[in-house]
Design a protein with these regions (language model features):
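A glycine- and small/hydrophobic-rich beta-loop-beta segment
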Residues: 150-227, 231
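Alpha-helical scaffold segments in soluble metabolic enzymes
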Residues: 65, 69-72, 91, 109-112, ...
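Gly/Ser/Thr-rich active-site loops/lids in small-molecule metabolic enzymes
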Residues: 52-59, 135-165
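Acidic catalytic cores of enzymes that act on phosphate-bearing nucleotides/polynucleotides
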Residues: 99-145, 154
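Internal alpha/beta core interface subdomains
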Residues: 3-4, 8-109, 113, 120
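Short acidic, glycine/serine/threonine-rich loops at helix termini
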Residues: 9-15, 43-45, 131-135, 140-142, ...
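Short, small-residue-biased leader/transition segments that mark boundaries at the very start
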Residues: 1-7, 232-235
Length: 236
């Protein structure tokens, strides 16, 4: 676990839920797990990182600032319930001890493995069209789930990414709102959903389903790949 990784907290989740509810019909369809607000803190340079857990005075100062700031937003802007500083602090004192054996300098650990000619695999999640810069903005995630994200996320140079493999479903899916030109709002879509067990891994929501969009595949391949694999749906 990288020491520089930002921590997602209960106030991120509370803000995510409040912000999404306030948008009405303009909802993006987030998982409401606080990912966006956590990334916002990172960009605003007020995020709390794993390494802060091991300097408790620094952690307490950062947590106090964040709780005060987030509670103002929750109560004054969104008319929502505030979060409790003491409860969060008590939780993270326990988390710090439990996580300590797993915290390391992942950048150097990965680079060391590469230089020792060990096999290193970076596995991405989500999809190209959810990329913050290259996806269907604003209906995107907060990070970069493309090949370049492996380099920046792991902290190794792009020259170390020797082979980039892409996996494409034989049909298209989407969770949440956003454009979906080939979506099938009919029996075909239902069959694809049933056949592929297409339900969100976090929310359990039924995924939107439709035909494979080769223009999207071409676009994604240009952004990412040296090899592509199309998965074949099979019946249970």
């Amino acid at each position: 676990m990288g020491s520089e990784m930002c921590i997602r907290d209960s106030y991120h989740i509370a803000l995510d839920m409040a912000e999404e509810a306030s948008k009405g019909d303009a909802k993006i369809g987030t998982t409401k797990n606080g990912i966006g607000p956590c990334y916002a803190d990172k960009v605003n340079r007020i995020g709390i990182r794993i390494c802060d857990l091991y300097d408790m005075e620094t952690f307490k100062q950062k947590l106090a600032y964040n709780v005060e700031f987030k509670n103002k937003m929750l109560t004054k802007v969104y008319d929502a319930e505030p979060v409790n500083y003491d409860e969060i602090l008590a939780d993270y004192i326990k988390y710090a001890e439990a996580l300590k054996p797993y915290v390391t300098d992942t950048n150097n650990a990965v680079l060391k493995a590469i230089k020792e000619d060990k096999k290193v695999l970076f596995e991405g999640a989500q999809a190209t069209m959810l990329d913050l810069d290259h996806g269907t903005y604003p209906f995107v995630t907060s990070s970069h789930p493309i090949a370049g994200g492996a380099s920046t996320g792991a902290g190794v140079g792009p020259n170390y990414l020797k082979n980039i493999f892409g996996v494409v479903k034989a049909y298209a899916t989407r969770v949440g709102a956003g454009p979906f030109p080939t979506e099938q709002l009919n029996e075909i879509g239902e069959e694809l959903r049933t056949l592929g067990h297409e339900f969100g891994t976090v929310t359990g929501r039924p995924r939107r389903t439709g035909w494979l969009d080769l223009m999207v595949v071409k676009y994604a391949a240009g952004l990412n790949l040296s090899l592509i694999h199309i998965s074949e749906p099979t019946r249970p």
